[in-house]
Curated annotation (Swiss-Prot):
Descriptive protein name: Armadillo segment polarity protein
Locations listed in the record: Cytoplasm; Cell membrane; Cell junction, Adherens junction
GO MF annotation, one: cadherin binding
Source organism: Musca domestica
Listed Low complexity bias regions: 765-775
ARM repeat spans: 139-178, 180-221, 223-262, 265-304, 349-387, 388-427, 430-471, 477-517, 587-626, 628-667
Keywords (A to Z) from UniProt: Cell adhesion, Cell junction, Cell membrane, Cytoplasm, Developmental protein, Membrane, Phosphoprotein, Repeat, Segmentation polarity protein, Wnt signaling pathway
One GO BP: Wnt signaling pathway
Topology of the protein relative to the lipid bilayer: Peripheral membrane protein
One GO CC annotation: adherens junction
The gene coding this protein: arm
Amino acid sequence: MSHNNQYNPPDLPPMVSAKEQTLMWQQNSYLVDSGIHSGAVTQAPSLSGKEDEEMEGDPLMFDLDTGFPQNFTQDQVDDMNQQLSQTRSQRVRAAMFPETLEEGIEIPSTQFDPQQPTAVQRLAEPSQMLKHAVVNLINYQDDAELATRAIPELIKLLNDEDQVVVSQAAMMVHQLSKKEASRHAITNSPQMVAALVRAISNSNDLESTKAAVGTLHNLSHHRQGLLAIFKSGGIPALVKLLSSPVESVLFYAITTLHNLLLHQDGSKMAVRLAGGLQKMVTLLQRNNVKFLAIVTDCLQILAYGNQESKLIILASGGPNELVRIMRSYDYEKLLWTTSRVLKVLSVCSSNKPAIVDAGGMQALAMHLSNPSPRLVQNCLWTLRNLSDAATKVDGLEPLLQSLVQVLASTDVNVVTCAAGILSNLTCNNQRNKATVCQVGGVDALVRTIINAGDREEITEPAVCALRHLTTRHADSEMAQNAVRLNYGLSVIVKLLHPPSRWPLIKAAIGLVRNLALCPANAAPLREHGAIHHLVRLLMRAFQDTERQRSSVATTGSQQPAAYADGVRMEEIVEGTVGALHILARESHNRALIRQQSVIPIFVRLLFNEIENIQRVAAGVLCELAADKEGAEIIEQEGATGPLTDLLHSRNEGVATYAAAVLFRMSEDKPQDYKKRLSIELTTNSLLREDNNIWGNADLGLGPDLQDMLGPEQAYEGLYGQGPPSVHSSHGGRAFQQGYDTLPIDSMQGLEISSPVGGGGGGGAPPSAAPTSPYSMDMDVGEIDAGALNFDLDAMPTPPNDNNNLAAWYDTDC
């Protein structure tokens, strides 16, 4: 017979001769002891020869052409071929319908490679699947029919007065609810669900309660079941079970409520009305981590977007328990769900201090190095929301170090949160400022700003944090130098112009002012164009304020101040002039400022009703008047009159700067002019002394300065913890310096609202639109009282950037 007409059994590999097939099957079936006679364990021979070294010499394993030793005759081989053919139907039957074979019958296998199923085996797979589907369908139908017939009787038994009967019925229903068909039948019977709810509400029998609530738990995995439970009034009954001492009952109740809260409309309100929040907070004292994870997730669902729920959690002691969980466990899902609750509560002004007082900042900081990104993100969000209430908290050194490290993350949200937290925690806190500087925070923040590009959600808080670090603490000069050494000056100056928005520009102005305090930064800032950009911003903001002033004068109405992106243009005027004031200390910078034709604006600002603007204008004129050219331009612009008027200002800083400018302008004047000016300055000083309303009260200041300061200036200006109001001695309007509450995304926080007090002209604080979410730090020093004499043999020393009324740009604010 030719090779092409050779017969190949369908379940053997093709292209093998009949003799070779028989030999292979014979080896598989006969040459290996089955264990029936010898009792040895049945095993398939190794095809690689590695399992039995004695098989290495067997030529059959490697070369079928060599044949077998001459142990079998041709007749024996023919018999084996015949047996193989005769058992084919049995092999098919065994593969497709194994349950029809009699026990004890062995069918020889024809599988050569265990990794390659035979044709029969491949054909058997769909038939087995079909068989199982038919069996399942029959069972499903049987279950459904059984449940449908049994439900009416079971309802009667559940309503029986005998608790034993109720218990037995509840257990039967529980068993039925474990199968899909009967579970659907129970769900479709409102009477059955109502009977189960009555059973858990009225029964005192533990087994009845456990079986009934277990059934409701099984039903709650399906939307139809959730609706049935809700309509049957199951939520109050389930909430009642949250007081059960039995673990299984508690588990069934809380998981059923959890499913309802997740997927059933109206469940949240029903749980709140049933007192579920209080009971859930009590359950936080347990120690089963998986149980606690469900409870905390329920609390998060109930508290999200509902202020009343947040206050109930607070009144029940929730913050303390939640912080305890964050400190005590390492189960990731529990930590994640708990951090979600804390995140929701952290936007509540009442819960925020409670969480901080409970040690929430430290507890959340423990998990910033956790490998779970979702946990780290939630902790950072929560810390950001809490950070404005934690500016006075001690022991945050580990948190600050972690935040500096987190700034290197590639996750935008992580970096945004870390920068915002650092901005708030370094506000008005010298210890935190020093800590951040010592752990490389300045370098990290500069790199963050460079890498952020135009992502203002990162650059604004990072710039605010740098502004805090560059003023009012022992390492501030080091921080000012570090920004330059890390190539940050050019990047920061670029933030002063588009596409930056006004809140970022305002923050950058304050940072530039602080950086200019370092003499080594004066020239680089000039070379990078800082003066040009500041002057441009000043002119733009000044024009806007003048336009607004003209509009008010024309219409006679009280129009609100000029705003852009929530920033008052008066703040930009004040900040830019203040920064130019510091930059003008350097002679080359003064020359460049004179060339910008901006001195007329400085003179006009002397008439402004906002005292801080008057002060910074007088301050920059004081520096510019140090050069003869500058003094001449100032006089030509008509500054003598307003400066003379400002000598009588109750704001000591304004008066002193005005006196200094007038003195410098008088250097080339005749002796008679100098004498009249000396009398004017001396008279003004005496008037201040005569009008001293403090008497002999000791404020801890030099006697001359104490005599010249009013009460609001002494307390708010020198020792205030927040930005005070800027008031005018001429009865001008108060100027809002602090920041109102400004939520970020769905989260509230990041601000410190400051009391706005009246001084001098007094007045209630106006409502001002929020300008930035980041808290600001007061930068206030002391004026050298000994220099405040007006003997014209020596020019009066101007305030050394230590202003009675701190301006926003001159602060961490």
